[in-house]
């Protein structure tokens, strides 16, 4: 399991729109707890998630379905 890309660079204060596509055979979830955003995506489906990074720093994201994060489904949003 993985997110591609696993590192996303953004500018502080800029509205970001992520378009997600689940190309796997199992449901997945994108959880960005720092932004209060989470989305479950069924196999073959797409979803859009929007957020604004309020300050510079690294923000973690991951799939919260049990076992997926430890299997490598995680990443970082780098805001500058």
Predicted regions mapped to residue ranges:
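N-terminal edge beta-strand
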Residues: 1-15
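Extracellular/periplasmic metallocenter environments
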Residues: 2, 43-80
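Beta-strand-rich interaction surfaces with strong enrichment in secreted/lumenal proteins
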Residues: 5-8, 36-41, 49-50
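Conserved strand-loop elements at the edges of beta-sheets that form or border functional pockets
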Residues: 10-12, 32, 43, 53
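Short beta-strand/loop motifs in extracellular/secreted proteins, especially
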Residues: 16, 26-28
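Asparagine-centered strand-capping/turn motif at beta-strand->loop junctions
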Residues: 20-22
């Amino acid at each position: 399991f993985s997110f591609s890309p696993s590192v996303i660079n953004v500018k502080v204060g800029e509205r970001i729109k992520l378009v997600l596509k689940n190309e796997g055979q199992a449901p997945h979830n994108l959880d960005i707890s720092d932004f209060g955003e989470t989305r479950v995506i069924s196999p073959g489906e797409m979803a859009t998630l929007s957020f604004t990074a309020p300050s510079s720093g690294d923000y973690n994201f991951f799939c919260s379905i049990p076992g997926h994060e430890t299997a490598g489904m995680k990443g970082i949003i780098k805001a500058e």
